[in-house]
Amino acid sequence: LLPSFSPFESEEEGNLLFCLSVDDAFRWPVTGEEVGQFDCGGNNFGVYRLPDGSYQFEICDEKKALCCYLQANADFSDCRAALVAESDAGRKFGLNNALMLVYAFASAPYATLLMHASVIRNDGRGYLFLGKSGTGKSTHTRLWLSHIPGSDLMNDDNPVVRVVEGTVYVLSLIHI
């Protein structure tokens, strides 16, 4: 479904940040207490919390169509998703967003923050352009590429900012 993610697939047990299994027949037996409904650029994420500290998410696209159910334990190390969209595009959307959510929460204890930004690299530094979708982040990035020598595109959607021993790094993750 997401060929660009295939290098990260692993059957090995070990020191993994998280495990996300996909089972389209999965449904939770009980819905947790609603934490909130969050508008994410026109998409909606319903978030619920169970008494044991685990989380449930309903990931909907911009048309409010349900694409994915996601359940995660309290530290997001063990997660299950059901891709319920009818179209391949909806299933990809659901899986991509489930992976981003799980990564963001599972990596947070390691001083990381998944951002919605476009990043230019120049002279060994990363410059993040932040803003809502459609506000010109990628346009600004293209202007740097065209007019500022030595610039290259590091990531055009979801970079990760990480602090290691007081130094801030920007990292590029894969994107569909």
Task: Identify the residue ranges that each predicted region occupies.
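Conserved glycine(s) of the Walker
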Residues: G136
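Hydrophobic positions on the alpha1 helix immediately C-terminal to the Walker A/P-loop
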Residues: H140
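A noncatalytic interaction/capping subdomain that flanks phosphate/NTP-handling catalytic cores
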Residues: L1-S133, L143-D152, V160-I174
